[in-house]
Amino acid sequence: MAQTTTLILLLATLLVAATTVSGQGPHIPLAPSPSVNEAMNCAAGLAVCLPAITQRGPPSQECCTAVETALTTQLSCLCGFIKSPMLLIPFNVTDFNALFSKTCGLTTDPNLCSETAAQAPLPKTAAPVPGAPKSDKDAASKLAGTGLVGIVVITIAAMFY
C-alpha cells in the first residue's frame, strides 16, 4: 500500500511540475518540445523503470531497453528527467542519467542535455523582429497536453496497483 501511495505521489508531483514549467511565460525551447503522443509514449515507456527507482534495485532489461529507446528517439522527454533531478529526490535518486547509464551499460555524453547539445539539432530560423514580446498562443494547448499526459500516466500506474 505504501508503495502504491508513493508511486501516485511521484506521478502527481511530476504532473504538477510539468504543468508549472509549461505554463510559465514565453521562452525559447532548448530542445524541440515533444508532441502529446511522443510525451505519452515516453512516459509510458519509462514507467517500467519505476520499480528500479522506488525499490533502489537494478533496473530490469525492459527498463534498460526503454531508456535506450528514449535516448535515441525521445531525447527531449528523457532530458526532462535528467534536467529536473528534484522530481526524483524523494526516492534518493539525484542523478537519473548516472543511475541508468551505469546499471544498464549505456554510454551517454554528460553534455547530452546541455544547452549547446540541445540546440545543435535545431534548424536555423529567422531572427525575431525586435519589439513587444509575442504572446504564446499555444500555452493552453501545452497545459492541456501536459495534463493529459499526467492523467494517462497516473491511470496506467493505478491499473497496475
Swiss-Prot record:
Positions glycosylated per UniProt: 92
Any GO CC annotation of this UniProt entry: side of membrane
Pfam families: LTP_2 (PF14368)
SUPFAM superfamilies assigned: Bifunctional inhibitor/lipid-transfer protein/seed storage 2S albumin
Lipidation, GPI-anchor amidated aspartate type: 138
Membrane disposition: Lipid-anchor; GPI-anchor
The keyword Nucleotide-binding is annotated on this UniProt entry: no
Protein family (similarity comment): Belongs to the plant LTP family.
Name of protein: Non-specific lipid transfer protein GPI-anchored 24
The organism of origin for this protein: Arabidopsis thaliana
